[in-house]
Amino acid sequence: KKILEKIKKRYEEIIDGLDLNLNLDHEFDKIEENFLAKAGRDYAASRGEYLNGLVMAEYLGYEFIDPAEVIFFDEHGVFEPETTNKELAERLEHVERAVIPGFYGSKHDGSVKTFSRGGSDVTGSIVAKAVHADIYENWTDVSGFLVTDPRIVKDPEVISTITYRELRELSYMGATVLHEGSIFPLRQEGIPIHVLNTNAPQDPGTMIVENTCSKPKSTTFPPAQTAFKI
C-alpha cells in the first residue's frame, strides 16, 4: 500500500504539472483490490502502461482504449490474431484518434496477458493492420537499423531501406531494434514500417518494405562461430 501511495503521488504530480482534469483515485483503488486478489505478474507489469495511457489520452484529448478489451490470448497465453483483428477493426471503425497502451491484452477469463519484451511493437503493428494503415511508424531509441554491429565497427551507417525478408534475417543474427512478432501482421497487409528515433526525430530512420532493388545493406558476424572449408 505504501508503494502504491508513492506511485499515486507521482502521477498526481504529473497530472498537476500538465494541468489536467483527471482523477486516478478509482484506478488506484482497483489496482490495490486486484493486487490483494493476487491478480498476477502480468497484471502488475501492465499497470504503468495502463495509467500512462490514461494520462496521455487526457492530455491529447483522444479516446482511451484498454488493450484488455480488444487484444486477446487463448487460455494457454497464445495470441489470437483473427479475434483481435475483428474486435479492433470494429472498435476503431468510428474512432478518429485513440490512445491504446502497448504490450498487453487479456485471456478469455479476463486476466491480463503480456507479450514478450518489446511487445509494444507488436501492439502497434496489430492496430496498424486493423485500421489498414498506409504506414506504421515505430518510434524507438535508435535511428534505425545499422549496416553492422556498432560494437565491432565504429559509427556504422544507418540502413535507409530494408525488406521484410532482410529484416527477418537480421533478427536471427541478433538485431533487436524491432520485435520480430510485429513483422508478420504488417507484411500480410503490405504495410511499410518506418523506424524512427524519439530522441532524434529529425533523423530519417529506416523504412521496411516488401521489395527493394538496392544493393546488399549489412554485414553480420555471429560471435562464437567458426567456418571450415573442405
Give residue spans per PLM region.
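Terminal amphipathic helices with adjacent charged low-complexity linkers/tails
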Residues: 146, 195-213
